[in-house]
From Swiss-Prot:
One of the GO BP terms on file: aflatoxin biosynthetic process
Superkingdom of the source species: Eukaryota
Transmembrane regions listed in the UniProt entry: 18-38
EC number of this enzyme: 1.-.-.-
Record's protein name: Cytochrome P450 monooxygenase aflV
Enzyme class label: oxidoreductase
Organism: Aspergillus parasiticus (strain ATCC 56775 / NRRL 5862 / SRRC 143 / SU-1)
GO molecular function: heme binding; iron ion binding; monooxygenase activity; oxidoreductase activity, acting on paired donors, with incorporation or reduction of molecular oxygen
PANTHER family assigned to the protein according to its UniProt record, in alphabetical order: CYTOCHROME P450, CYTOCHROME P450 MONOOXYGENASE STCB-RELATED
Pathway where this protein functions: Mycotoxin biosynthesis; aflatoxin biosynthesis
Length: 508
């Protein structure tokens, strides 16, 4: 009897329809998910945090807001209703308190970049911007940091940067005199050429020819294609697509975009290596390449890491600069009195316009600060994972399994911190004006702490030079009829804020 029992059980199992097995496994998975959702909603420490009831059960509403490019507005509406800390998903909390935000992002806080940042790598390995491990990030950052200091940029690169900016302004001026100039496109080309030139000595004549470097084109395609998203959100569909892509050319272009990008990126490494020993055109990858050749145990990079970092630097250094300049020009051209004052200020500069001279112009710098406050290029989510023991923020305990988010759209527009927060008022930044301590720690258009933007000084240099040269060479510029308040509404496009129309045109 005992010996036959297992056999009978096996026969019984063999006769169970396959459909039933799928239903059983699927049902068990659904039940486990429901149990986890209910545990999180009703037993997690996060249950005490204010927020809409549905956020305790699902992130669907938040996901829809992200998909619709209006996450910043949705999250802000929750802050307006529930306060400076709000639950936006079952295990996701958004904070609009400047003191808590500083606690999260300061050096040594224990908070690390959330898993979301895996999406921001164009290659198969982590890069300078999405490392979650603080030590790995620090080691990689040291390879590039010296080249991005303000003194280094002014001594080695300012003439090159100024020439690229000046040519861009002339192209804008020419187009504007012929009809209209689409400035977002031109500023993007300017930033592309600058970053390519500094990082790997590439991007030659991008502005002059009006076309992007092939590596930049492939990078943009890679970061925006379906395969990149499926790889992170639906791996089975991604691998199915790669399998089918071997037989279907159209699918091959989509699902093998990473390989195509790396093929285009081979010239990045080749150009960087060729310039390494040259007395003239050096680049920011010189130290990284040298460390790799010496087989250093600390910091040596292989070709894959070089290409991936080049892609990350281009993503972080191109669109943000272009978008910041676009909104700055739009803000000023909407205010004729301010435009006249700024044109007069830059007209008073003697000789060649230098970054140091621009840094001393009060109106120019006040305009840059205020446009970055209202229309900074990164208005959206900056998610972080808490330390292993969790953290207390705004009086609430946040467990290590949660994700804590801050967004500059809320920090830069808080009525508790800023007077008339939604009004463009450059005078708040002029010498003699007094900003509250909360305002000072709230203003972080380039991030803060150890993860502050590596290229912050390069960004500021381009903003200063481009603003000065534009208003010196294009006095009397005005917005084209196609550029309206509606077309310039900022949308939260995944990793950057941009105009709804994705363009901004001016005339002379």
């Amino acid at each position: 009897m005992t010996n036959t029992a297992p056999r009978e059980l096996i026969r019984a199992i063999e006769h169970v329809p396959l459909t039933w097995w799928f239903l059983a496994v699927g049902g068990a998975w659904i039940v486990s998910k429901i149990i986890k959702i209910l545990q999180t909603a009703y037993f997690s420490p996060l249950r005490k945090i204010p927020g809409p009831w549905y956020a305790r059960l699902t992130s669907a509403r938040l996901a829809w807001a992200s998909f619709a490019n209006n996450r910043i507005y949705y999250v802000q509406s929750l802050h307006d209703k529930y306060g400076s800390i709000v639950l936006i998903g079952p295990e996701e909390v958004d904070i609009a308190d400047p003191v808590a935000a500083k606690q999260i992002h300061r050096m040594g806080s224990g908070f690390v970049k959330a898993p979301f940042y895996k999406l921001l790598s164009p290659g198969p390995v982590d890069n300078i911007f999405n490392f979650r491990d603080a030590k790995l990030h620090s080691t990689r950052r040291k390879l590039y940091a010296k080249g991005f200091t303000l003194n280094s940029l002014r001594q080695q690169w300012e003439p090159t940067i100024r020439n690229i900016v000046a040519l861009t302004v002339e192209r804008i001026r020419h187009d504007a005199q012929q009809g209209e100039a689409e400035i977002l496109g031109w500023w993007t080309l300017m930033a592309n050429e600058t970053v390519c030139k500094l990082t790997f000595n590439g991007g030659h004549d991008t502005v002059r020819n009006g076309t992007k470097d092939p590596f930049v084109l492939m990078l943009e395609r890679r970061m925006g294609d379906l395969a990149h998203l499926l790889q992170h959100f639906a791996p089975p569909l991604y691998y199915l697509g790669r399998l089918l892509g071997r037989a279907v050319p159209r699918l091959h272009d989509v699902f093998f975009s990473q390989e195509t990008m790396f093929e285009a990126g081979k010239h990045v490494v080749a150009i960087a290596r060729s310039a390494r020993d040259a007395e003239g055109d050096r680049n920011l990858f010189v130290k990284a390449l040298a460390a790799g050749d010496l087989e250093s145990k600390i910091g040596g990079l292989n070709d894959t890491e070089i290409i991936t970092d080049a892609g990350a630097l281009l993503l972080a250094g191109s669109d943000p600069t272009a978008l910041s300049l676009t909104y700055l020009i739009w803000c000023v051209l909407n205010r004729p009195k301010l435009q006249a004052e700024l044109e007069s200020e830059v007209a008073g500069l003697q000789g060649d316009i230098t970054d140091a001279a621009c840094a001393d112009l009060p109106i120019l710098n006040a305009v840059i600060y205020e446009s970055l406050r209202l229309y900074g290029p990164a208005p959206g989510a900056m998610p972080r994972s808490p330390p292993p023991d969790g953290a207390t923020l705004c009086g609430y305990y946040i467990p290590p399994s949660a994700v804590v988010v801050t967004q500059n759209w809320s920090l830069h527009g808080s009525p508790k911190v800023w007077k008339d927060p939604h009004t463009f008022d450059h005078t708040r930044w002029l010498p003699g004006s007094s900003l509250s301590e909360e305002a000072k720690i709230s203003f972080n258009p380039f991030g803060q702490g150890a993860r502050q933007c590596l290229g912050i000084h390069l960004g500021w240099m381009q903003l200063r030079l481009a603003t000065a040269l534009f208003f010196r060479r294009c006095p009397g510029a005005k917005l084209a009829p196609s550029t309206t308040p509606e077309s310039m509404v900022m949308i939260d496009s995944f990793i950057a804020g941009m105009p709804k129309a994705r363009r901004c045109a001016i005339q002379l």
